[in-house]
């Protein structure tokens, strides 16, 4: 399983890169899809026969469906009870956290954290 966020994906350097509808976001969608495909390809090369990809950024409609690796099974769209981990169950052998941002208070790109009772550093 891959839980794929966009804020730590290849090329992302500022907020405008991940805001749906912007020119920068359109460019980053291609790079994000490439990151996911590279991960899927690596998992398949390592023996995976099917890879669930839970898209986990913003409205969760960022990956380019027509370019997604054929071994990927995509879970997309909002209102998932388990949010970024939707799809996890006893059949999942492992999880890759791909493209996640750094934690609030760190010096990384787009650093923020969602905690159980609070939200910190949302831009």
Predicted regions located by residue number:
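Short coil/turn connectors at secondary-structure junctions
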Residues: 46-49, 70, 90-94
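Internal, conserved structured core segments that host functional sites
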Residues: 84-123
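Short, well-ordered, mixed-charge alpha-helical segments that flank or form enzyme active sites
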Residues: 10, 60-63, 102-108
């Amino acid at each position: 399983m891959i839980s794929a966020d966009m804020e730590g994906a290849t090329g992302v350097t500022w907020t405008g890169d991940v805001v749906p509808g912007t020119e920068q976001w359109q460019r980053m969608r291609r790079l994000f899809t490439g990151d996911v495909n590279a991960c899927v390809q690596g998992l398949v090369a390592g023996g995976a026969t099917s890879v669930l990809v839970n898209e986990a950024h913003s409205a969760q409609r960022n990956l380019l469906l027509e370019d997604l690796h054929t071994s990927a099974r995509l879970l997309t769209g909002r209102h998932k009870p388990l949010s970024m981990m939707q799809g996890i169950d006893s059949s999942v052998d492992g999880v890759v956290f791909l493209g996640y941002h750094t934690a609030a208070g760190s010096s990384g790109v787009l650093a923020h954290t969602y905690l159980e009772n609070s939200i910190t550093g949302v831009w």
